[in-house]
């Protein structure tokens, strides 16, 4: 990956922006930054339809990876212009907030948009409800479509599933932006730098996590 980044930057005389990844450690971030990337995708195995960690044993919790890469970026001013993109594990607006507070400049989200009308995917009816097909890019099904099947000696690191249809993507975007704006008021932040400076991460118990959700709806 590092050599490919160097090659692209060389043949384009440094004019083509390059995003590389995915990585899970600050050390990997540094190597890509020194190769000349403009942004690094951070996160291995955290996607909702990814099974890389159970198939390979490789991966770090996405938020921990973001923190590690952010600290690596702070270690040298030469890396300050390299953006961090958190990729994986985004389910709720709070996950966006935590990613940005931990040091990410942006996120990549799949499932939350895959369920919308604006995303590609076949719509079906299952048990009286509308659903869409959601396929991992490393799934067996995608490999069969693109390459005629898995290559010998390889394994699928993703799965395919059906997810309930949500409606238009703009409603999802509005909800996530609303959550971010509200979070910034809670920590008295006027911008993303303020969000990082004013946020504090603490460990919580499973019961505290349960309390964080709207538990009043449970029967």
Which residues are covered by each model-predicted region?
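Glycine/Thr-rich beta-alpha phosphate-binding loop at enzyme active sites
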Residues: 1-4, 16, 21-66, 115-125
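Alpha/beta catalytic cores of nucleotide-metabolism and tRNA/nucleoside-modifying enzymes
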Residues: 13-15, 35, 57-86, 91-219
